[in-house]
Amino acid sequence: RPDSWKFVALYLLGGLAQTFLLLNIAHDSNHNAISSRPRVNKTLNYVFDLCGISSYMWRILHHRGHHSCINLHGEDDALSGRGIFRFTPYESRAPWHRFQHIYALFLYAMFSLDYVFFRDFESFFFPSHDYLKRANHSLRECAILFAGKGFYLTYMLVLPVMVLGKSPLLVAGAFLLVHLFVGLAVTLVFQTTHTIDTTYFPTDRGEFDNGVYHIFATTADYATENPLVGWLAGGLNHHIVHHLCPFVCHTHYAPLTRIVKQTAEEFGVPYRQHPTMTQAIRHHLILLKQLGNAN
């Protein structure tokens, strides 16, 4: 029916808005990069919870499980393939990894659903990393975790049925479509900056003289001269600058990237980049194919 298509279109538009909010506001506030006032950043950080993701767990996983250990096997949470993917040369290879470059995009689309229904609870109640086991979760954060999930699922699934009178099947289908889009978009924004065929996977934290060299070796930019991509990705296509200056708002990344690139060339430090996001995705899939077919 026409009304159903209108509902689905508006529902998908809402999902697109959630993606922009996550990449442009929530991520920056998580790094205290939006305002010099901590209360402002903390308040905006709850955008994660409004979108069904625990801001508390994201902060722990993203800061301790990524920024402090980029591309380190067994430490960087972004490299956790749960046996489905092989993201580093140091992970054991399984027969199905030969096809990971084929099924990757489909499973990446499940990323958002995984975070909403499983990942946050798994990290909170059944921690696997040492930094998660050492975390002393307060009762308040536990309450916010459940309240955020409940609020999100209520306005996304329950209210359209009860208030708008839409069929549960239609709402569930629209919900699935939204998360397939959000999951694929967010995953590709991040995966194309670290896990590509030209980045490096250190064996330990002390492999480089300082953290700056570590960042340059393990991180790559893409489409840095394309303002539209920068706007859509919340500046995360300028990923080297993001890791060098995580407390700087992404609206400053473009000019800073030009300075960083020039300085890297001046001191002979390799600067990795791709002119387009499409090429970055291609090189990510090349790495997956390489890791799936050889040790």
Per-segment meaning from a language model:
Residues 13-137, 205-294:
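Membrane-embedded catalytic scaffold of the fatty acid hydroxylase/desaturase
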Residues 161, 177-208, 288-291:
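Extended hydrophobic/aromatic segments used for targeting, binding, or gating
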Residues 3, 61-65, 144-147, 197-199:
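Short low-complexity stretches enriched in small and charged residues
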Residues 121, 125, 162-165, 196:
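Juxtamembrane transmembrane-helix termini
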Residues 1-22, 49-53, 101-113, 137-189:
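Alpha-helical bilayer-embedded segments of polytopic membrane proteins, i.e.
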Residues 121-122, 169-177, 186-193, 202-204, ...:
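Composition- and surface-driven signal marking solvent-exposed, interaction-prone regions
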